[in-house]
């Protein structure tokens, strides 16, 4: 009798170990990534990638943010595996300011910035002394000023790094444009809707999130050609070699996702690989 009890106990132990082994094996097969993103278009693009990643054994959790500060803090605090909301100059500025040890794991798309106005239908119509409202994100100032220089409204000093230019680098301003830069980027669409200022510079993601059409509503749009403001997947240094991160970037750069971006946003968002 004791012999049978011993055999029964041994069998139960073996079955339990086998079940644990299967459980551990299942855990190994499904890897989870937590990615922080802006609502539009970043989170929408990630949602499109979700089923593709699932087929590759990766469970994607998307955490959305309404500003440009918290996603990097959350990444630094290891609350996220990656974030997808910022362009390269902004990442570099944030790393310098806060000491973040991040890297660019891959570029995904470009969001051409637009000039919006309730009062005027073209840049040429802007009057002398027109008030130009832009975000308080210094990393976007060079981008905005470079666009306005390209459109012939101002001239920047020779030799200045266009991605880091400030209003102090303006050497010619024939319309005497007045620049205001004290508004959070996410609030700019409301500033435009309230008819404040003569022109408002709005990033495409915030324009889309506010129900604007970045391909039709602006009176002028930044050129996507040779544009350094590529929105990227940012990770902590060292994580760029993780298989899950590499797979995430590969999927987001795939033809399926590129085609989705082109069809969904109709030129307001452009795949970086195009």
Language model features: what each stretch is:
Residues 107-117, 142-149, 208-250, 252-274:
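Periplasmic-binding protein-like
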Residues 28-40, 58-64, 131-132:
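Short, well-ordered beta-strand elements
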Residues 39-61, 70, 74:
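Short, polar/charged alpha-helical segment
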Residues 76-86, 130, 153, 175-177, ...:
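Alpha-to-beta junction loops
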Residues 63-73, 161-190:
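Short helix-initiation/N-cap motifs at beta->coil->alpha
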Residues 105-154, 258:
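A conserved helix-loop-strand patch within extracytoplasmic ligand-binding domains
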Residues 15-19:
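C-terminal motif of bacterial Sec signal peptides marking the signal peptidase cleavage site
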């Amino acid at each position: 009798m004791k012999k049978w009890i011993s055999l029964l106990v041994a069998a139960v132990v073996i079955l339990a170990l086998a079940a644990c082994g299967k459980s551990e094996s299942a855990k190994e097969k499904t890897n989870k990534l937590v990615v922080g993103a802006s609502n539009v278009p970043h989170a929408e693009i990630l949602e499109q990638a979700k089923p593709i990643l699932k087929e590759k054994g990766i469970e994607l959790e998307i955490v959305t943010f309404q500003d440009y500060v918290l996603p990097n803090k959350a990444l630094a605090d290891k609350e996220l595996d990656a974030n997808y909301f910022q362009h390269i100059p902004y990442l570099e500025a944030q790393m310098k300011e806060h000491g973040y040890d991040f890297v660019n794991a891959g570029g995904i798309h470009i969001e051409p910035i637009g000039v919006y106005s309730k009062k005027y239908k073209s840049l040429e119509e802007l009057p002398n002394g027109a008030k130009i409202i832009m975000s308080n994100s210094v990393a976007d100032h060079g981008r905005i000023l470079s666009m306005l220089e390209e459109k012939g409204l101002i001239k920047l000093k020779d030799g200045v790094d266009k991605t880091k230019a400030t209003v102090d680098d303006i050497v010619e301003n024939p319309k005497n444009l007045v620049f205001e830069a004290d508004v959070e980027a996410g609030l700019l669409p409301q500033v435009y809707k309230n008819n404040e200022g003569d022109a408002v510079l709005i990033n495409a993601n915030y324009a889309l999130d506010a129900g604007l059409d970045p391909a039709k509503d602006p009176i002028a749009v930044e050129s996507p050609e040779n544009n350094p403001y590529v929105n990227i997947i940012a990770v902590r240094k060292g994580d760029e070699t993780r298989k899950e991160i590499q797979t995430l970037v590969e999927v987001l750069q795939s033809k399926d996702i590129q085609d989705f971006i082109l069809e969904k946003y109709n030129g307001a968002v452009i795949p970086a690989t195009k």
